[in-house]
Amino acid sequence: MNEILNTKDINVIGEFFIETWGCQMNEEDSEKLSGMLKKEGYIRTEERENADVIIFNTCCVRENAELKVYGNLGILKGLKSKNPNLIIAVTGCMMQQKGMAETIKKKFPFVDIIIGTHNLHNFPNYLNEVKKKDTSVLKIQEKENSIIENMPIDRKNSMKAFVTIMYGCNNFCTYCIVPYVRGRERSRTPENIEAEIKKLISEGYKEITLLGQNVNSYGKDLEPNVTFAELLKRVNNIEGLERVRFMTSHPKDLTDDVIEAIAKCDKLCEQIHLPVQSGSSEILKKMNRHYDREKYLDVVSKIKKLIPNVALSTDIIVGFPGETEKDFEETLSLVKEVEYDSAFTFLYSIRKGTPAAKFEDQVPEDVKHKRFNRLVEVLNEISAKKNKAYEGKIEEVLVEGTSKNDENKLMGRTRTGKLVNFIGDKDSIGELVNVKIIKANSFSLTGEEI
């Protein structure tokens, strides 16, 4: 169980700034970094210039994320010159890549701490080492640890929380670097997961998102085995919990038991993120996804049959090596058939160290961009159509705060994950309320509390 942080009575010894790139797992890692530092006596600042410690928590899933890290590190050189006592640390998946830590140290010698994903829990020790010995730390642990429990955590949100149920991935999709930087699959025990959720409920949290690179593989490494469907049922029975979400699911492992659990468990939200990556069976085979188009559509059909009002989202890669116009057309036709509520779309990006990086039939950049734009146009049309169907309906919304676009309105999300901006009572923040949807927008809904 992770420790919920109470920062009362801690003597302040400095300020820290964290910048995070990447997925929800990285976001939770940053919450743990923040928790550890606050326990040491630091306070968080949102201004780099005010910080005594600056931490970059990096991502390497796509090239663009790495380029952002390089650019931002370059900016820090000036800050370090002005304040030689500033401590700069870089961690995360990008650092876990073979040779990357040494590259960063060579390009940016002013960086004080470089660590990977497997020794994050030791960050306070490394920080103290730098401060006391006036030295730098470069420690990349190649082998993953057993799971570290009871880490302090500084949650960004007071009503919704991420709870990691497993770490790592065993799938080795040919384009993906994750198994190399996050290690093999390791599951937390259901007892530790339940204990963390119960603690969160006692702190006032209403919604939990269960995290893992492939949550459907949960429990296979435990003795005795516990299936993901069984875990969902156990979590659903926790008293006081209002909502449960999870991500990410791998289509090859999404069993009938899991679909049935979502349909029957009242706290499980009717929202499933099911990355397809491509609609072409030929490309899926090259990606090593372990399913084909027919299998994926069969899973979707089962989901829609048991959960008629489900909102489906997905990930799609455009321009994977060898993708022909025919392959891309198959992706478009699958998108139209499934009718996703939303999608994360990406241009294929070569990841050094993955099998796909060596594939010779790379797709030209201009072709990738044209296909990407065509795909986004289709997805946006479908999303607008799906949102339009909400007009006139009454939806349960967890009120998260005031709207970013209009401080006189509130904002929150439906059980299906739709963003709703609505007129309501500010006393409702943190509560579940019923909202009548008045208008559908391209990427959100507008309504009024009833």
UniProtKB/Swiss-Prot annotation:
Alphabetized GO MF terms: 4 iron, 4 sulfur cluster binding; metal ion binding; N6-isopentenyladenosine methylthiotransferase activity
Cofactor note: Binds 2 [4Fe-4S] clusters. One cluster is coordinated with 3 cysteines and an exchangeable S-adenosyl-L-methionine.
EC number annotated for this UniProt entry: 2.8.4.3
GO CC terms of this entry: cytosol
Database matches in PROSITE patterns: MTTASE_N, MTTASE_RADICAL, RADICAL_SAM, TRAM
Domain MTTase N-terminal: 14-132
Record keywords: 4Fe-4S, Cytoplasm, Iron, Iron-sulfur, Metal-binding, S-adenosyl-L-methionine, Transferase, tRNA processing
UniProt binding sites for [4Fe-4S] cluster 1: 23, 59, 93
InterPro entries in UniProt: Elp3/MiaA/NifB-like_rSAM (IPR006638), Methylthiotransferase (IPR005839), Methylthiotransferase_CS (IPR020612), Methylthiotransferase_N (IPR013848), Methylthiotransferase_N_sf (IPR038135), MiaB_methiolase (IPR006463), rSAM (IPR007197), rSAM_horseshoe (IPR023404)
Binding of [4Fe-4S] cluster 2, residues: 169, 173, 176
One of the protein's GO biological processes: tRNA methylthiolation
Gene3D superfamilies according to UniProt: Methylthiotransferase, N-terminal domain (3.40.50.12160), tm_1862 like domain (3.80.30.20)
SMART domains named among the record's database cross-references: Elp3
Pfam families, alphabetized: Radical_SAM, TRAM, UPF0004
Subcellular location: Cytoplasm
TRAM domain span: 388-450
Record's subunit section: Monomer.
Xref: HAMAP family: tRNA_metthiotr_MiaB
PANTHER family reported in the protein's UniProt record: CDK5 REGULATORY SUBUNIT-ASSOCIATED PROTEIN 1, MITOCHONDRIAL TRNA METHYLTHIOTRANSFERASE CDK5RAP1
Protein family according to the UniProt entry: Belongs to the methylthiotransferase family. MiaB subfamily.
Primary role: Catalyzes the methylthiolation of N6-(dimethylallyl)adenosine (i(6)A), leading to the formation of 2-methylthio-N6-(dimethylallyl)adenosine (ms(2)i(6)A) at position 37 in tRNAs that read codons beginning with uridine.
Protein name stated in the entry: tRNA-2-methylthio-N(6)-dimethylallyladenosine synthase
Source species: Clostridium botulinum (strain Hall / ATCC 3502 / NCTC 13319 / Type A)
Gene: miaB
